[in-house]
Design a protein with these regions (language model features):
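A short, N-terminal "cap"/entry segment at the start of jelly-roll beta-barrel domains
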Residues: 4, 14-69
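Short hydrophobic/aromatic-rich beta-strand segments that constitute the beta-sheet cores
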Residues: 55, 83-85, 139
Length: 146
């Protein structure tokens, strides 16, 4: 079994464990690969129920984001990006309930994300796809909310 597959299985197990602890229903949800692939091609929601949201995202560089109640697990499947977490947001603005955005951040920890990488971002932590040299980065976002 390839390392990337092992990492995805380990992360999925962790997410299911965390989700169960947060009160997310423990019912089985099956999504066939063709729907997952179609969703990844355009971006969108794969699963959305009671505190657990799984998205397929395809994007370029963006703004700094903070989500008050959302914990993220990002699983990179294509492309590469410079990703920044933490630091102090420059001129933050509330853009929706529980969500703050800014154009940049001072300080923070920088990571170079590529295919097969997994990164977790706790709620209330600034995070930013600062640079995407491949023009787009594709990833699954597993979002857990209380």
């Amino acid at each position: 079994m390839k390392l990337a597959a092992i990492v995805v299985i380990a992360v999925a197990t962790m997410v299911v464990t965390l989700a169960a602890a947060k009160g997310v229903p423990s019912t089985v949800t099956y999504i066939p690969h063709d729907k997952v692939n179609t969703t990844m091609a355009k971006g969108g929601q794969i699963i959305g129920e009671n505190g657990l949201i799984v998205l397929a995202n395809r994007r370029g560089a963006g703004e700094v984001e903070v989500h008050e109640n959302t914990n993220h697990v990002f699983i990179i499947v294509e492309g590469e990006a410079t990703f920044v977490t933490g630091g102090t947001m420059v001129e933050p603005k509330n853009t929706a309930p529980g969500q703050i955005r800014a154009k940049s951040v001072n300080g923070g920890q920088t990571y170079h994300l590529t295919k097969g990488d997994v990164i977790t971002v706790p709620a209330k932590t600034p995070h930013w796809f600062k640079d995407v040299p491949t023009q787009t980065i594709a990833y699954y976002a597993v979002n857990l909310e209380p």
